[in-house]
Design a protein with these regions (language model features):
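Core nucleotide-handling region used for phosphoryl-transfer chemistry
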Residues: 1-323
Length: 323
C-alpha cells in the first residue's frame, strides 16, 4: 500500500499531531514499479550512491535522524563517532535558508563508515526534500551540496543510452563492484525502485548488517572461511585481521594449557568464566575418544582449535572478548 511506503522513516509529534520528519519513500520491486509507471519515457533514472541516509528536520532546533535512529547524537555504526559528529565534520549548509517545515534527505559518505563503495573524500549529497505538511517532494537546490547525477529524463537526457528495462539491467550487471546500480523514480518522485548491481551485492554480503569489526573478522576467519575475499575488498581490515587471529590463538593456547593443568595434572584452578564451558567441552572430547577404546588419544592444541571453530560466532566472540 502507498501509505506504508510513505510512512518509511517518518517521525510524529503526537502532542501536536503533526509529522516533523519525513524521508525517502520505501522502494518498490521492479515489477510493482512497472505496474505504477507504465511508460518508459516517464521513468527518471539517477545514479545510486552507497552511503548512510541522513534526514535533517526541525523540531525546536535542527535535528538529524537515520534510517534506524531518531537521534544521531547517540547513534553510531562502525565509527567511534556518532552520525551527528560525522555529519558536522563535512556540513557546509546555511541553516538560515532552510524551510523549517521541510525534511532534507542527504546521503553521507565518510571514510570511517565505508560500506562497499570506495570513499576517498568525505561528502554529502542532497537526495531530496519533503514538505512535512503536504507530504509532497519539493525541488530545491542547496548551495555547495551536490545531488546524484541525473542519467535519464524523458527524451531530453539519456546518458546511459538505454531505451528499455532489459537494456538497463544488462548495463547494471556489467558495472564494477564499487557501483550499487541505478535508482528509478516516477517524475513526481512518489514511487521509486532500484536496479541492483550483482557485483556490488556480492561484496555487500561480506559485511552486511555487521558493525563490529572484530566479530566480522572472527566469523570470516573461522566460520565462513572467506577472509581472502574480505581482505581483497577491504584491505584496510588487514591489521585488525592479524589482531583477531592472534587473539584466537592466544585463547586456544591458554585453554590447552589450562586443560593440561586441570584435567591431566589434576591441579585445582579457579577458572575464569569464559574458560569453564570450553574446558568441559575439551574433556568431553577426550572421554568420547577413550570410550572408543582409543587409549592413546591425547588432547592437542589442534583439537582445542577445532572445538573453538565449531562454536557459533556469537559464543566464540563472547569467550575471546568477555565483557
Amino acid at each position: 500500500a502507498d501509505y506504508i511506503l510513505q510512512s518509511r522513516g517518518i517521525i510524529i509529534d503526537f502532542t501536536n499531531k503533526s509529522v516533523i520528519n519525513s524521508s525517502l519513500h520505501g522502494c518498490l520491486n521492479i515489477e510493482q514499479f512497472y505496474d505504477k509507471i507504465l511508460n518508459w519515457n516517464s521513468i527518471v533514472i539517477e545514479e545510486c550512491l552507497d552511503g548512510t541516509l541522513i534526514n535533517l528536520y526541525y523540531h525546536d532546533k535542527w535535528k538529524l535522524s537515520t534510517k534506524f535512529s531518531i537521534d544521531t547524537e547517540e547513534s553510531k555504526f562502525k565509527s567511534h563517532k556518532t552520525f551527528k559528529e560525522l555529519f558536522n565534520e563535512i556540513n557546509s549548509i546555511d541553516f538560515d535558508i532552510l524551510d523549517k517545515s521541510y525534511t532534507y534527505s542527504f546521503l553521507l559518505q565518510h571514510t570511517e563508515i565505508r560500506n562497499v563503495s570506495l570513499v576517498n573524500v568525505n561528502k554529502l549529497y542532497h537526495l531530496e526534500s519533503t514538505n512535512n505538511i503536504t507530504g509532497e517532494k519539493v525541488e530545491i537546490t542547496i548551495p555547495n551540496i551536490e545531488k546524484p547525477k541525473l542519467l535519464k529524463y524523458r527524451d531530453i537526457i539519456n546518458i546511459l543510452n538505454v531505451n528499455n528495462l532489459s537494456e538497463l539491467i544488462i548495463k547494471t550487471n556489467n558495472l564494477p563492484w564499487t557501483n550499487p546500480g541505478y535508482i528509478l523514480y516516477s517524475e513526481d518522485r512518489k514511487y521509486r525502485s532500484k536496479i541492483e548491481n550483482p557485483n556490488f551485492i556480492k561484496v555487500l554480503n561480506l559485511v552486511k548488517d555487521q558493525s563490529n569489526l572484530k566479530f566480522l573478522i572472527l566469523e570470516s576467519l573461522y566460520k565462513k572461511c572467506n577472509i581472502k575475499d574480505l581482505l581483497k575488498y577491504y584491505p584496510e581490515y588487514s591489521t585488525k585481521a592479524v589482531e583477531v587471529n592472534t587473539d584466537f590463538n592466544n585463547y586456544a593456547i591458554k585453554l590447552h594449557k589450562l586443560y593440561i593443568k586441570c584435567k591431566v595434572n589434576n591441579v585445582f584452578v579457579d577458572l575464569e568464566k569464559n574458560f569453564k564451558k570450553t574446558i568441559c567441552d575439551v574433556h568431553n572430547l577426550f572421554k568420547d575418544e577413550r570410550k572408543k577404546n582409543n587409549q592413546s588419544f591425547k588432547i592437542t592444541y589442534n583439537h582445542v582449535c577445532n572445538i573453538l571453530r565449531n562454536y557459533d560466532t556469537a559464543y566464540l566472540y563472547s569467550i575471546i572478548y568477555p565483557k
